[in-house]
Amino acid sequence: ATIDPAVLFIDRCLQLLKPGGRLLIVLPDGILCNSGDRYVREYIMGKKDEKTGEFVGGKAIVKAVISLPSDCFKLSGTGAKTSILYLQKRHANPNQPEQFLPEPQTDVFMAVAETLGYVVKNNIEDYNAGVANDLDKIVSAYKRGE
């Protein structure tokens, strides 16, 4: 069976993080919402316990998901819809370093960036077009806990 390279990349990023380390990664939206990629979400967050509603066994806590504009990577030749995923690696159990401590998945901050501070004209990014960068407002809202 073939494995999506994005999945291998996520796995490697999590391996390289120290316990408690943070990761911001741009991913295709399919990984975040396609039913066929559920195993990726369960690998990251763990499986949801139907009784408690808690996620058990995951490698990371999802802190935020920020949806990016569909034309964000247009100049690189892709029209794939993407999002920024912000994760924090769970802390290792001191008695069993290969196991993670059962840290609760907190509420996930979610936002949509409609503009990134530029427009594409004649295959060139124009940053002087007077377009706002929604990421500034989104980061401020995250820091305020909104």
Question: For the regions a protein language model found, what residue spans apply to each?
Answer:
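A conserved structural/catalytic subdomain of Rossmann-like adenosyl-cofactor enzymes
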Residues: 1-146
